[in-house]
Amino acid sequence: MTNEFLHFEKISRQTWQSLHRKTTPPLTEEELESIKSFNDQISLQDVTDIYLPLAHLIQIYKRTKEDLAFSKGIFLQRESKSQPFIIGVSGSVAVGKSTTSRLLQILLSRTVTDATVELVTTDGFLYPNQTLIEQGILNRKGFPESYDMEALLNFLDRIKNGQDVDIPVYSHEVYDIVPEKKQSVKAADFVIVEGINVFQNPQNDRLYITDFFDFSIYVDAGVDDIESWYLDRFLKMLSLAQNDPDSYYYRFTQMPIGEVESFAHQVWISINLTNLQNYIEPTRNRAEVILHKSKNHEIDEIYLKK
């Protein structure tokens, strides 16, 4: 962290966990295991120390938003409309965004009375592979230009205005948008939007994606650690694909392991690391909270915007 983060307060794990009264995590070890990402590590102690205080903080922000909306309604002399509380979650590939998002979905639905919580990943807003091929940018998949940012903005606008929306579905197994398949997203009490690009600006700079967020989280870690987690995940995906010819990873199961490791490392260097350094990490300071993970995946530091 540099002077770029002077407007953040650095909080140790020990201090953070003391900011919320100790309660029993509202999920079991088995549930936690079922929602964690393929190569991630998380414990019920992490839920107690990190995520329950975070869920409590989010509820504080939600109440503050509702109070402001009520006061604005009085000023405008009209009844304020209830809107979903939208949470953006960003960070590198393989850093654990999905685990954080799925866990928050459970915690908010179980700690806020009668709350409904929707979870959306921005992978569904990637252009289909055929479109990327036609545009000559298949090798730029994951970079800003490979996303239909206007569609993402339109989705956020409609959700913010209380409309239910159907969005495309992306499959990591086939490495493409699934034709004819849609995810129906309700305008719930909370809508969590997770993806590497959620803090980035569309090419139309007059509108910012972050303008739609009521709270935002960046999951951070050292570059060497993220690379190690990415390579580990890549190899584990191969083991799942051994008997699945439809999987994107099946082709790699037919290659010598040395070639596979070399290929995965090259993908990390040329795509994921470049994307992280040029487009993802520079948006880090747009988050309200930064969760920093150590080598063993444990969150050791929290940065809260002042």
From Swiss-Prot:
Localization, per the record, is:
Cytoplasm
Give the record's pathway.
Answer: Cofactor biosynthesis; coenzyme A biosynthesis; CoA from (R)-pantothenate: step 1/5
Q: What is its EC number?
A: 2.7.1.33
Task: List UniProt keywords, sorted A-Z.
Answer: ATP-binding, Coenzyme A biosynthesis, Cytoplasm, Kinase, Nucleotide-binding, Transferase
Question: In the UniProt record, which is one GO cellular component term?
Answer: cytoplasm
InterPro entries, sorted: P-loop_NTPase, PanK, PRK/URK
Please classify the protein's predominant subcellular localization into one broad category: cytoplasm
Tell me which family the UniProt entry assigns to this protein. Belongs to the prokaryotic pantothenate kinase family.
What HAMAP family does the entry give?
Pantothen_kinase_1
Q: Which PANTHER family match?
A: URIDINE KINASE
Identification of the protein by name: Pantothenate kinase
